[in-house]
């Protein structure tokens, strides 16, 4: 193809637009966006983090990394083909000191960080990140003053929050977490986070008496806590958009990471939903958490431990908060004030007054989290984004998602933001919960929706791929059915590095992490989904992981890079040093398609890439234009000139640019006329592979025996479950007979 000039794509907000369900470039080609979350380090302040009671002093300047290091990190991500970045920003980073006082140093740092991406052709969207509402609830996100406005006591390093069971705070304190390391998600059901989420979304409905005084236009007024929190959040969003929204490296903003309804929608304050809410450790009911938070020692609080085949089971009951610590600075629980419950001095226990309080509005009608609270706020947020983008040039997408582990809800067009992108998350919940991945994988998504247990078990690597693919396609199909032609991007997906008792740290054998990651990315490819892997965190270390709640997801670590370079027999400054799983993360994919994608697959073992798409046939013998050729990323770490072959559908022309790691493909037949091939977008295919690479998966005898044993256990569980149901039916029938005098 001598003499033909092929342009390499450079992502830029000014040249990306949305057409139906696709992102497209300025040439009308369909973009496949993939990249990383940068980074988990941004969940916590720069070292050293202040004490909880000194939360106003928190600074996030230098998170995720120092500006002088940025060029190397962007170059590394580009070399891996990960050019679509989700930038983690917390509300606390923007406004930690007090309401209305923004950290200008951080905003200047963030702007410079985003500008530094431009020479590398990377593009980003900004995600306002939260987990469990705030660091001061045991997660990340909102500033400490939001909890104080609601009445929580953050004094003395948050001691009363911890002692009263209102929050699990051990995981946000720097260092290796001892004991049970999977407790942080249970924070959503603890008093602090559940209350804050309820107040943020539905304070006017569920806590109308909770007012916050403040000045507006020089006058002191009292506003409902919902209005106070939402106005502050939207003002912080406006500040963020004004600071970076004009940059061509910024192609969008995300409303909120993994929004949660808190208490809204729970059927009874006597229990949480076992099928959707992780029950682990000391796990009080909402009523028990009210009692504990109000400073009462509370008996009969269940303690859950890990089990099989159900994830957890009750193994004991304890008297929680025996010290009588109170989570409220005023010593008054707002839920007691609103008549949800009361403390009985006579019985020395909490009594429910309105057990279904959180499913009704003020008029007694049933509430719906999405329709009544979430969608109205999305519309307010959309207005703020639109009003504060100073430049109309280029795409500013609006990323939104559903409640974690829920499928896309019904979402009317009038409730959707402009340039909407649906951005769900997906993880293998069984691997996350057990910190194990091996011969057997489980479809937790299916189990939560009533799938028979034997259908939810998968054995072997190929089956794990099928498991992941089914779960991803279920999420995508639900979004397609509810939203129609709206782009879908998986904003988070990833694999823990510390699975299987941290064996890989000791042996250097990352095969199980590689298999899980390969299954994950293969599932995304099978569904033609773009994605952001969680997470690229240079601050990661083997001993403390990402230094937040014992999570360890980063496949790159500066600490490991330093060790490897120090111990290397010969000097190496390659960008790959310090990374893991690159054999499955760095893979070919279609960057820009002249036509419509129909299927994508990559076998990381065989190094075999197959891409099918519908593309027009050219009739000109002249050099193809960017509108006419498809551009594929072909990483040189896998595909070498001397060992790579390819085939292409009839009429296909291929140009490989080995230096720039690109394949350009187009289809032509100069013997035809334009009229004869009008609207001809027939299926095309290109296959690229490395000669002689093929690895077969074989089951060992031990693995076969394990599969048989598990299947037998599944049958027994099903049998006894059916016996239990029959016994229940028998008792009901007997009761009916007695009631009718039979």
From Swiss-Prot:
Residues forming the catalytic site: 258 (proton donor), 492 (nucleophile)
Coiled coil: none
Catalytic activity entry: a beta-D-glucosyl-(1<->1')-N-acylsphing-4-enine + H2O = an N-acylsphing-4-enine + D-glucose
GO CC annotation terms, alphabetical: membrane
Pfam families listed in its UniProt record: Glyco_hydro_5_C
Domain of life, per lineage: Eukaryota
Keywords annotated in UniProt: Glycoprotein, Glycosidase, Hydrolase, Membrane, Transmembrane, Transmembrane helix
GO molecular function, one term: glucosylceramidase activity
Membrane topology: Single-pass membrane protein
Family: Belongs to the glycosyl hydrolase 5 (cellulase A) family.
Protein name, UniProt field: Glucosylceramidase
Organism: Cryptococcus neoformans var. grubii serotype A (strain H99 / ATCC 208821 / CBS 10515 / FGSC 9487) (Filobasidiella neoformans var. grubii)
Source taxonomy: Eukaryota, Fungi, Dikarya, Basidiomycota, Agaricomycotina
């Amino acid at each position: 193809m001598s003499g033909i000039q092929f342009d390499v794509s450079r992502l830029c907000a000014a040249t990306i637009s949305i057409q139906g369900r696709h992102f497209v470039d300025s040439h009308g080609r369909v973009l496949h966006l993939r990249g990383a979350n940068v980074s988990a380090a941004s969940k916590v302040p720069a070292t050293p983090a202040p004490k909880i009671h000194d939360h106003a002093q928190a600074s996030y300047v230098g998170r995720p990394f120092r500006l002088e290091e940025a060029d190397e990190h962007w170059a590394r991500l580009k070399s891996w083909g990960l050019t679509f970045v989700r930038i983690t920003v917390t509300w606390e980073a923007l406004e930690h000191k007090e309401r209305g006082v923004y950290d200008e140093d951080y905003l200047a740092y963030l702007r410079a960080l985003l500008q530094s991406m431009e020479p590398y052709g990377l593009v980003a969207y900004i995600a306002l990140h939260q987990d469990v509402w705030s660091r001061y609830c045991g997660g990340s996100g909102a500033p400490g003053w939001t909890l104080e406005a609601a009445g929580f006591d953050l004094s003395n390093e948050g001691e009363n929050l911890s002692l009263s069971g209102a929050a699990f705070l051990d995981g946000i304190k720097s260092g290796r977490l001892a004991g049970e390391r999977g407790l942080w998600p249970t924070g959503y059901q603890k008093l602090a986070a559940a209350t804050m989420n309820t107040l943020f979304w539905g304070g006017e409905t569920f806590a109308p008496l909770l007012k916050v005084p403040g000045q507006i236009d020089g006058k002191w007024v009292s506003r409902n806590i919902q209005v106070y929190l939402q106005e502050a959040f939207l003002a912080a969003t406006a500040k963020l958009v004004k600071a970076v929204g004009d940059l061509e490296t910024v192609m969008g903003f995300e409303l909120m990471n993994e929004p949660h309804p808190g208490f809204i929608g729970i059927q009874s304050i006597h229990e949480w939903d076992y099928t959707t809410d992780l029950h682990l450790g000391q796990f009080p009911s909402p009523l028990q958490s009210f009692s504990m938070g109000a400073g009462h020692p509370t008996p009969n609080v269940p303690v859950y431990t890990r089990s099989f085949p159900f994830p957890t089971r009750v193994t004991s009951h304890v008297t929680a908060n025996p010290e009588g610590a109170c989570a409220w600075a005023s010593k008054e629980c707002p839920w007691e004030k609103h008549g949800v419950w009361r403390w009985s001095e006579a019985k020395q226990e909490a009594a429910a007054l309105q057990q279904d309080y959180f499913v009704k509005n003020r008029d007694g009608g049933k509430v719906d989290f999405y329709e009544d609270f979430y969608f109205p706020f999305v519309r307010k947020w959309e207005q703020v984004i639109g009003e504060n983008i100073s430049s109309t040039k280029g795409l500013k997408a609006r990323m939104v998602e559903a409640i974690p582990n829920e499928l896309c809800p019904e979402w009317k067009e009038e409730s959707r933001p402009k340039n909407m992108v649906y951005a769900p998350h997906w993880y293998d919940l069984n691997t996350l919960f057990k910190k194990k991945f091996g011969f057997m994988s489980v479809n937790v998504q299916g189990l939560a929706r009533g799938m028979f247990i034997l259908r939810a078990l998968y054995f072997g690597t190929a089956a794990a791929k099928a498991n992941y693919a089914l779960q991803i396609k279920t999420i995508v199909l639900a979004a397609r059915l509810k939203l129609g032609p709206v782009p879908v991007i998986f904003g988070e997906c990833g694999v823990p590095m510390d699975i299987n008792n941290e064996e890989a740290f000791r042996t250097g054998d990352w095969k199980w992490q590689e298999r899980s990651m390969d299954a994950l990315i293969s599932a995304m490819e099978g569904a033609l989904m773009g994605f952001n892997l969680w997470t690229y965190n240079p601050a990661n270390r083997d001993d403390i992981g990402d230094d937040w709640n014992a999570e360890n997801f980063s496949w790159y670590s500066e600490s490991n890079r330093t060790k490897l370079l120090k111990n290397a027999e010969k000097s190496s400054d390659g960008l790959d040093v310090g990374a893991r799983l690159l054999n499955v993360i760095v893979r070919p994919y279609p960057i820009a398609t002249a036509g419509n994608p129909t299927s994508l697959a990559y076998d990381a073992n065989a190094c075999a890439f197959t891409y099918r798409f519908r593309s027009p046939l050219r009739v000109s013998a002249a050099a193809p234009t960017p509108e006419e050729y498809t551009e594929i990323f072909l990483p040189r770490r896998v595909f070498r000139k001397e060992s790579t072959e390819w085939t292409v559908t009839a009429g296909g022309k291929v140009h490989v640019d080995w230096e720039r790691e690109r394949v350009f493909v187009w289809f032509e037949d100069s013997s035809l006329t334009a009229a004869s091939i009008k609207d001809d977008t027939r299926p095309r295919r290109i296959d690229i592979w490395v000669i002689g690479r093929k690895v077969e998966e074989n089951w060992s005898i031990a693995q076969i025996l394990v599969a048989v044993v598990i299947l037998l256990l599944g049958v027994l569980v099903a049998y006894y479950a059916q016996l239990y149901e029959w016994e229940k039916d028998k008792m009901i029938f007997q009761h009916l007979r007695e009631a009718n005098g039979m």
